[in-house]
Amino acid sequence: MKTIVINASPRKRWNTAQILKSAYEGAKSVGADVEYIDLYDIDLKGCMSCLVCKSKKTEKVKCYWRDDLSPIIERILEADILLVGSPIYFGKPTSHFRALMERLIFCILSYDDYGSYYKGKLNVGLFYTMNAPEDVYNEVYEEDLKENENLFNLLNANVITYPVFNTLQVKDYSKYHMSAFNEEDKKEFNKNQFPKDLEEAFRIGAKLSKKIK
């Protein structure tokens, strides 16, 4: 099984990256061939509306824009599992997450019947890390983020969403203008909860990457 893990956070060692590295190890634990990509390292744009993927003269299930993201999309569509993680900024995943989703999903979407040109099956794990507590996610973010899950359903397999709540933004809040947050409470919460989130990310990575016999 081929698993591609994509970090759509600009931070390579903080919450989202740690969650994804745990999912990566979970995938490896069941024998998957795993590739890890930091999305902020590559030159990319969102969908440029060139519509070449919708032309009657071109091959379907392919993004034709010439930048570093197109070959990654090609590898994703040849893989078996996609694990993507993003922090939540102003209630939404990052712009890089959005760019990936736009171009990956648009190039497989049929404008004849709104079905999917993609005939394979790609399991998807979506990991969102956020400063917000669980009640805010439930009341404000969850319904909106569910739309992303609906789009990834066009890849014809399982889609699992895992939110990580009340994360630490920095190690030492006293160095920043962040007095709205209770550092002691956040650190205590993360001390107890974040290891559980890492374990769950490992489990999801393994579950989605496990070869069905």
Mark where each language-model region is:
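Beta-strand-loop-alpha "switch" segments that mediate conformational coupling across diverse proteins
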Residues: 159-171
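Short, glycine-/small-residue-rich phosphate/pyrophosphate-handling segment
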Residues: 95-96, 108-162
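Structural signal for conserved beta-strand scaffold positions within catalytic alpha/beta enzyme cores
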Residues: 36-38, 65, 126, 161-164
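Flexible loop residues that form catalytic
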Residues: 87, 132, 167
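N-terminal beta1-alpha1-beta2 submodule of the flavodoxin-like/Rossmannoid cofactor-binding fold
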Residues: 1-113, 171, 180-213
